[in-house]
């Protein structure tokens, strides 16, 4: 991270020094001269200074060329590109532009072909060409040649030379880094690039070594980078020929630089030729070409170049822009990226011109160095495309759409070759996408049918032309274009300042929407975008970009290991801590934090570790490195979460991982396009890979469901889901929340039966809840509901996504409730939470949406969360997160068991409402009314691994599966947040706990939950709150259905309630104690599925504890007798007390564990008994007795294990015994407890203390 930061800083400095900052630009220099100089210097320095430049070296895993190009319109802050790349790129891409640049820059001095030649595949890392063109003032780009040259030369000379780096960093926003997107072999400085390539790549773009050759070394390894092949982006093929300067680079100079360096250091002559051509054509043309090239490069390269090992906050902005303009550049980049995820991010956009000072930033990111994201242009284009990973509000990077006009420039044959190579190896999307490079405006992290994540760079203009290309290859672009169209349709009303995040996201996603706030665009617009409903298109684009980035980040994370996760975690924490301070900002930052938290959770769930690392790393990088380019404060603000980490967190690694793992069904994508106008439904096609059943219907309606399911069909790539989901969560959270809550929420409620909404997955962060049915936990392992939506309208993360079923992959990221609450409160509360609003407007929980509380938590749009009914067992993980909330989700402690798979969505909803409302622990009005219906724990085995006692089991009485415990355990940070929210929903929690305690009527639910849990278990959090069929809203006073409330309440409640609603808990304790006294003697205590209604749900918060409070024998749900009165739901500060007071179960964790064990035991016993019961070997009464006794025995076994074999043996012994008794006229019920079953003591070896046996 530091390395990335340094590189970034250096990049900024180089940009500023070279360009003297946007203000300091040399008026004397003509724009073309400026750009040429910048490019030349960048290339030269990149060649010599890739590794030499310490920061840039960090940036350039391999050599990285930085060119500072200033065009009248765009002033490339610093263009880093391998010499070969630059030459090739310049020659291929922007002949005139390059020629101008070359002429201005001293080609011989700047270009150091020797470096490239040095170690074509080894030293020099693959470089990713990231170009950021800021267009604003075209005129003097005071990129002082002298300053540029010295820096470039210094950089070339020594990898630690900071001059260029420094210049680049100050000018971070404007620096153009042309790197060999190809990640050609790092030049001799490769050591530095190598070191950074593994994980530093502070500057995602700079990390790309200026590899004159474009070897596709493995992203992590400078030389290996080109060895590492990106399955989705056959960069290897393109990269394999490192010496193909002209081939690598396409008509667009920025992109060409990347491929060129990969192909081989373009000779200065080539660059000069390009410069000449550029001068002839003029800066605008050159810029358009660059943008086109960038778009082309980005199309495939960016996606393909996910630096698994690179933390490239900087890179984050660029990676999304992977549209291949002609397809070659992206492919070339992609080709190189294959080996080493290399991101070429070119942000060139006339649209952003107004807001941007004329700046062209071309960043070449090494596969291993994602850190160097393009420095955001603070005032730059309002429409930061999704394609570009936009820095948070602080350093909005212009994801300006590359000039579509530049499109005429087709990649040269060599570039085309690269594209073709990349396309074959990579999903077809790569090659076809290239032609649409001009549309790279919005880069969405879409995955091709082949599973390659690709960024759509095309705007609406591109779709017709792109359609042919889109057929197999440009799906992303096509989707992106449609998104843009939708966004434009809706963008007119994007949004109020609250939409700041959204606005930013939208800008990133679609260059069009955010022009107005371009200056404050960084922070405010991002937030507004996040919130804006209208900015669905941009949200989608951003989601895509995010998912891609995230995917890459994940990939890198896997390669890098925990490094990224650690840094990301730190950054997230920083964000969390930082975001609260500003008041207005605090809500948006809270939202951001929430999203980040969710993302964090999502990362853990999806990649379990690798994703979590990627997320953390991405978040960190995006937070720190991403903001580094603009300034330290920018970085800090990013950390704070000025922009939801959705994009920020998506590093190249993440995107790469997403690209690799997430496959979006093209047909689905194409289909959703038609609905593109529909902001809520149409914009998103949510393909929740993990949670196919993720209430797509609920979220987007039944069509959504179908789409989602189709998406689920393609959801085989859970990795993608992870990345996409993260992105979607981040970017879509606000929009999706708003839109889903408002627009789709009613549909969701209307279609509670539909599978759980993706919302659950976001909340679960693992999208485990996304599975509409337990059967639908298709990709639960990824634990992330990847919403594949054409439009990533953040406001309608799940619902819209499902409705539109558009091809874009919106990744819903679980965020902390804090960050989510701003979104959740208004939309979710108002729309589908009327009933819940009564309990507390602040914690209005969408009845059905709340059922998806997990998703809501993750997504911040609980309303969006699948309805409780829909969500039943959707995704164990997702559902659980409802209560866990973003933080809870993150906790995948209970997640491992994913008992929450069938957790009630309603519970989730209640949670989400509180989450939204009560950010601060303000014991909100406890949701006194506990779910009266006794919910059987459904053998939703609470994860024993649950760290937090938040895991709640919500046996839904209606659906056997639905009552899966939501072991949504949030990380402690998030737990605190959750607890705060729980204060608001103490009653809900109680209800949920009660439901959990309620006899687990549906062992199958438990089983499904268990399955989900298996997938989710690895997930960071237990977002396993599947919405239970009961769509009962979490009305605080009314009391939520035990089924829905149990899971969520237990999850969030156990921890949050404990801390936030102690008073409520005390009351709950009293109630539980009373119930305990009554029921503690009854072994079928909490799992008495028979008594679903009388659950002491009155303790909204205590429910979780109450379940646990039961000494294990007291069934919370079972004690249906306990009135659902808001007993002590009022925040009695004894929440914790309640749990501890109940039979010394002071430890909520213990209770949760016991409940979990008991539920699992019930599930196992039911499974074992079923055959006998079906054969009528035993009667119903005997069945109940055996179930109760067996569960009791298992729970009290010394081993504490639940061994299915032992359980079956025990059950068989009981059945035989009962049969024997029946034969001999003795009553089977006579023997108290398991009457001498063969394996009495350890039959199931359920170590759970005498949990109340839930007799069925």
From Swiss-Prot:
Q: Where is the composition biased (Pro residues)?
A: 207-222, 922-935, 1244-1256
The record's listing under InterPro entries reads: SCAF1 (IPR042841), SCAF11-like_C (IPR057031)
Q: What GO MF terms are annotated?
A: protein domain specific binding; RNA binding; RNA polymerase II C-terminal domain binding
| Compartments it resides in | Nucleus
Which residues are recorded with the post-translational modification Phosphotyrosine? 689
Residue ranges that the Swiss-Prot or TrEMBL entry lists as coiled coil: none
Q: Where is this cross-link: Glycyl lysine isopeptide (Lys-Gly) (interchain with G-Cter in SUMO2)?
A: 812
Q: Name one GO biological process term.
A: RNA splicing
Biased composition, Low complexity: where in the chain? 192-206, 412-424, 752-775, 793-804, 985-1017
Which GO CC annotations does the UniProt entry carry? Answer: nucleus
Please list the residues that carry the modification Phosphothreonine.
328, 663, 923, 936, 948
UniProt feature, compositional bias: Polar residues: 255-265, 938-947
Keywords of the record:
Isopeptide bond, mRNA processing, mRNA splicing, Nucleus, Phosphoprotein, Repeat, RNA-binding, Ubl conjugation
Instruction: Give residues where Phosphoserine occurs.
Output: 240, 442, 447, 491, 493, 510, 518, 520, 577, 579, 676, 682, 691, 695, 819, 821, 876, 883, 910, 912, 939
- Feature: compositional bias, Basic residues: 478-489, 538-553, 560-577, 592-611, 843-875
Which residue stretches does the UniProt record annotate as biased composition, category Basic and acidic residues?
7-27, 227-236, 612-623, 696-709, 719-741, 813-831, 1133-1152
Subunit note:
Interacts with POLR2A.
- Reported function: May function in pre-mRNA splicing.
Family, similarity comment: Belongs to the splicing factor SR family.
> What is the name attached to this protein's record?
Splicing factor, arginine/serine-rich 19
